[in-house]
Structures are given as structure tokens and as C-alpha cells.
Design a protein with these regions (language model features):
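Conserved functional hotspots at enzyme active or ligand-binding sites that engage polyanionic ligands
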Residues: 1-104
Length: 104
């Protein structure tokens, strides 16, 4: 696997989890900086789901032709060993929405 970059979306194995943490293998947005991604064995991710409550901290994106929500209330650090196949990269406008929500 090459260098993981901010804004890319990967399949990530989130199990095992506890309590209300989001489960299963699902798409996740990489939110950690490229500098961190180059040197650390972990990355910061925000899971993506096609379901879920429409909260302000859950910007909408399109993934595989379907609307999906980026769960900024479920941000977590994961080891790169949890990463699966790269799905793609989000648009710059969606990335701006993510940043605005994280800073709000």
C-alpha cells in the first residue's frame, strides 16, 4: 500500500468495538494530515454510512452513486493494518464542509 492521503476514502475494519461505536467494515474518510500519514502507523478516520440521523456534524457526500453521511461524531484513530481497498477521494467542496463542521 502506498502513502495514505487526507481526503481519501478506504474500506476500514472497525471491529471490535464497544458500546455505541460504529461497527463492521465500512467506508471511512481519512482526516489526518499527510505529514502524519507518512510517518505514523495510525491514521485518523471518520466513518461513512448511507444511514444514520441527519445531524449537523454529519456532512453529506456521494459514495458509489448514493448519498452518504460522514460521521464526524465517530472520528477515531486506527492502525493502517485495518485499511482495505481504496474507494476514492472526496471532492474539495465536501472536504471544505468537513473542515467547517469540525471547527464549528
Amino acid at each position: 500500500m502506498g502513502v495514505v492521503k487526507r481526503g481519501e476514502v478506504y474500506w476500514v475494519k472497525l471491529d471490535p468495538t464497544k458500546g455505541s461505536e460504529i461497527r463492521k467494515t465500512r467506508p471511512c474518510l481519512v482526516i489526518s494530515t499527510n505529514d502524519m500519514n507518512k510517518v505514523l502507523p495510525r491514521i485518523l478516520i471518520a466513518p461513512i454510512t448511507s444511514k444514520g440521523q441527519p445531524l449537523g456534524c454529519r456532512p453529506i457526500t456521494e459514495l458509489n452513486g448514493k448519498n452518504a453521511r460522514i460521521l464526524l461524531d465517530q472520528i477515531r484513530s486506527v492502525d493502517k493494518l485495518r485499511l482495505g481497498k481504496k474507494i476514492g477521494i472526496i471532492s474539495l467542496s465536501i472536504w471544505h464542509s468537513v473542515l467547517l463542521e469540525m471547527l464549528d
